[in-house]
Amino acid sequence: MTENSERFDQASLLAESGKSVEAAALYREVLIAQPKHLAAAKALAEMVEAGRAEGDSAAARKVVTDIETESTYSVGKTALIHGRFDVAIRCYKKILGLDPDYDDAIWGLAEACYGDRDLKEALRWYRTYSEKYPDDHEARHIVAALGEGPTPPRASDAYVRETFNSFAEDFDRQLLEDLDYRAPKLIHELFREVGGDDPGGHDILDAGCGTGLSGLDFKQYASSLTGVDLSPEMLKLAEARGIYDALLEEELAVCMRARPGQFDLIVAADVFCYIGDLSESLEAAHIALKPGGIVIFSVEAQPKRGYALTGSGRYAHKPAYVRKSSKIAGFKEIVGRTDTLRTEYGEPVHGYLTALQKI
């Protein structure tokens, strides 16, 4: 038994024997040594509320609430990460019963409800968060993704930037270990399939380069390798790989329009899932490519007409829409196929990969 445990037991015995002043003093010592000791905080709060110890009852009760919410939030977050959505939902609801303004619990409950496929409740809590923070780009985007309000033609630059800045440090681990992320490898395979085996000699743009996962595969084919991304935190990690000749913090279509006829190859792994209407991006890619240049990219596939903003906050496209849009932009499809891009919530995410040549 630790010294603090002995101190707590002694305080409890003193409280039972009616020695409230001495007991309260010891409970306070316990909390000084161990600020998150819930039992000591509860005992002291009860004594203060009953008038058996000095102090502000509201402040004493707040200490209890803070300890309970923090502890419960930790359990809820762990449950959410491991796909125990039922446990996470119970935890977040318990927190909000104690503190209705606990913002992280509101967001966590929205995420857990979405993971549990309760889209109505997910929308309710994302909307609650968005109403509290109307300038939060992610909340506003997801509310739209869940079907409330008009569907934007693309995710805002601010949303994309904030989303990827927030988990840049853990990006590679999450994608490769948790989600079995395959898009860069699939794009590399498609490149080799269309005759891109020759090492060196290509001016390549890694569009939405992120941390450089695609760049690792394509460096061997590049006389120059340029990466572009909206997230400065992702670009820092890409720079650390030492594989890029240039890294640009720019919006993709703007970047490509500003560099006419500069690239032999443009690759974009899981980039157009943040763009619904592909016309502007494909037109810009056509401008940036040299005559006969190739663009290879992936989209999340869906059977409905055109494109749709899904509840995940990402866009999915019908392959026929991709082919039609590329033809209008001045491309011919060399090859296209469906494959699994990654695993999410235990389910495969089906995608469409295409290699287009400028004509």
Residue spans of the language-model regions?
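Short, glycine-/aromatic-enriched active-site segment of Class I SAM-dependent methyltransferases
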Residues: 297-315
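A short glycine-rich, Lys/Arg-flanked "PGG" loop and its adjoining helix->strand segment in the class I
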Residues: 279-291
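A short acidic, Gly/Pro-enriched loop at the edge of an enzyme's catalytic core
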Residues: 257-266
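Class I SAM-dependent methyltransferase SAM/SAH-binding core
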Residues: 205, 210-255
